[in-house]
């Protein structure tokens, strides 16, 4: 799998591959407060970055996010198969843009299992009032 940093002017060409992945992320994350079109707008307006995973000219995964201070906030991560390679690309990209850590928020319990081998730890606690 080869990572490809998507340029905003290329987004229309790849949206048919990205949107279904975002919809799958949303199906598994019922507390998410965004829709795929929010992601489209953020990429198009250079507020977010999308890195595709390309294999044999096909999109097999992607992540969307943005740098903030010394961290890279991963907004959405999707892969057709094992997430390990995509996570490795995410860590590589974060380092490339000068970030020292990757952060994201999810209420999906499966992330604890996936991220254990990366020495990741829970980062956000929420108290509703």
Q: Residues of each region from the PLM?
A:
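Hydrophobic, Leu/Ile/Phe/Ala-enriched alpha-helical segments that form helix-helix packing faces
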Residues: 22, 26, 43, 90-98
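Conserved catalytic-core motifs of GNAT/GCN5-like acyltransferases
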Residues: 121-129
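Active-site rim helix/loop that mediates acceptor-substrate recognition in acyltransferases
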Residues: 29-48
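Generic alpha-helical secondary structure signal
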Residues: 9-16, 20, 37, 81-88, ...
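Short amphipathic alpha-helix that is part of the acyltransferase structural core
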Residues: 1-34
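Conserved donor-binding loop and adjoining core beta-sheet/short helix segment
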Residues: 44-82
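Acyl-donor binding region in acyl/amide transferases
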Residues: 69-118
